[in-house]
Design a protein with these regions (language model features):
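Terminal leader/tail segments of proteins
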Residues: 1-153
Length: 153
């Protein structure tokens, strides 16, 4: 991607949010929260690029669930989510299907998130201002805690 506007309002990856999630008592993966680093919310349909890397390993899109408004979406569904609004004050939970979870310790989380601002046209042919809402954070995960099932917010 060429030029993209960047506004650093918040850390994209929410501190201390990395944890395992369980389904029927079995560790099925891990999750963490992200925020939109922008001054207003947007519909999921304006997200043009979304990727997750953990410890420099790119997570396949089919293993990612983007949880918001009590619903789960795969990144390949974003273009159809024109009624799902991500409020700027609400974090989204990113669930990664990874049976057995991550090993205990620190892990580097990289989120690539580019969206277009639909009220900022920058040229002909329905082109809009791209916005960079990417983020990186190193967080620790432990096996301490419950084995409760985790639902989307």
């Amino acid at each position: 991607m060429g030029f993209a506007m960047r506004m650093n309002f918040v850390d994209v990856v929410v501190s201390d949010s990395l944890k395992h999630y369980y389904v029927d008592g079995k560790k099925m993966g891990y999750q963490f929260d992200i925020r939109l680093s922008y001054y207003r919310g947007h519909f999921l349909s304006v997200i043009d690029e979304f990727k997750v890397k953990v410890d420099d390993f790119e997570v396949p899109a089919e293993r990612i669930k983007f949880c918001i408004n009590g619903k789960e979406f795969s990144p390949v569904e974003f273009d159809k989510c024109y009624t799902e609004f991500w409020r700027v004050i609400e974090p989204a939970t990113i669930k990664v299907i990874y049976p057995g979870g991550l090993p205990e310790g620190e892990h580097k989380i990289d989120v690539t998130l580019f969206f277009r601002s639909p009220y900022m046209p920058i040229g002909p042919d329905h082109r809009y201002m791209p916005v960079d809402s990417c983020g990186t954070k190193t967080m620790a995960i432990t096996d301490k805690g419950g084995k409760e099932n985790v639902l989307c917010r």
